[in-house]
Amino acid sequence: MTAKFTDYIVKDIGLAEFGRKEISLAETEMPGLMATREEYGPKQPLKGARIAGSLHMTIQTAVLIETLVALGADVRWVSCNIYSTQDHAAAAIAAAGIPVFAIKGESLEDYWDYTARMFDWHGGGTPNMILDDGGDATMYVHLGLRAENGDTAFLDKPGSDEEVIFFALLKKQLKEKPKGYFAEIAKNIRGVSEETTTGVHRLYDMQKAGTLLWPAINVNDSVTKSKFDNLYGCRESLVDGIRRGTDVMLSGKVAMVAGFGDVGKGSAASLRQAGCRVMVSEVDPICALQAAMEGYQVVTMEDAAPLADIFVTATGNKDIITIEHMRAMKDRAIVCNIGHFDNEIQIAHLKNLKWDNIKPQVDEITFPDGKRMILLSEGRLVNLGNAMGHPSFVMSASFTNQTLAQIELFANNKDGKYKKEVYVLPKSLDEKVARLHLAKIGVKLTELRKDQADYIGVKVEGPFKADHYRY
């Protein structure tokens, strides 16, 4: 008799059937991942890979997880955000016998406990690959090893409420785990593929400091990720989150978007298409000029605070909306964030004010003067906290890149071509990912003749652009 599988923590395993139905629907909308299974499945390039995955536990991620398993990998999974888990997706993955530790609305204590549990491989041993979104799994090992090697002073100097919890976990691990626990993990990891801008910044910082422990592939800066997921994904999912959270009429409202990178561009377009009059703030003169040329009013947050009805942060930086900005806002202004972390808005400065929870991930905060503010997802990702995240089709492109990156680092690095540095996938794979998604939406490519290809100095089959080309 087979032992019952219990290596998971989900809200309700009874949601598995619902999750499986939605996974089936998503597979139809994720041609890149399904083609990857068909092409690479027989070769099993990830056989022997033990992947620790920290990425939003959604229906789309379930398709990614099952693709990795179909290619031979052994996987353990957590969500990279306390509000982004879709409980029926987590249940379906658990019911399939894949370890997953994720509950929508989990506490920060649970979040970090689940991250630690992800690294404790069932049957002994450690993971040998990381698939990360935001860099928390990567930081867990790097900072754990740093403390294990005797540099523990930083553990007594947390810079945020979350670091208080994270550093307490590291102290606990140092006491309870055998000596050399983090060193063993670090030694076994062959590489990490990183999904998002914030995590990529962390990787480049470590590379610059000479502390990066293993090769890393920056999936975020693949064109078929950043110019699609970040832009077109946000264009669809931002307004979905605001509407589900507030039920307000967006048409005619004044909206303020902080940041005009790819996420900001998609966010501004999302609000404009909903009928909002959109303002943008930027520190980069190039992005500011782009916003102005697109017809957006480019202002500062100080200018916008008393004018806008809706505020969205999309910068990847900290303290973008300060307590002073919030005090200057209209009564019941809506404030949310679509960057990876919750520090774009000074949430900590609001903790001593009156909070009224209206419904999950929607809070009304009252200031001493009686003015109120509507805060979505406590300043965390609004499109995943208040809605269902990006559509399956655009996530197929991102996750196909993730799968190819895992194959590169695990199966195609036997000659040691990947050092302890940050890389991007080659242009040929970027174009391959795009090509896999064309038929689904009825795109017919024009083909170059040989003489035309020679004329512009490319191969008939591509790549068609130089690495420095900006799409």
From Swiss-Prot:
Keywords: Cytoplasm, Hydrolase, NAD, One-carbon metabolism. It holds the Pfam family AdoHcyase. CDD domains: SAHH. It is an enzyme of class 3 (hydrolase). NAD(+) binds at residues 196-198, 230, 259-264, 282, 317, 338-340, 383. SMART domains: AdoHcyase, AdoHcyase_NAD. Belongs to the adenosylhomocysteinase family. This is Adenosylhomocysteinase. The gene is ahcY.
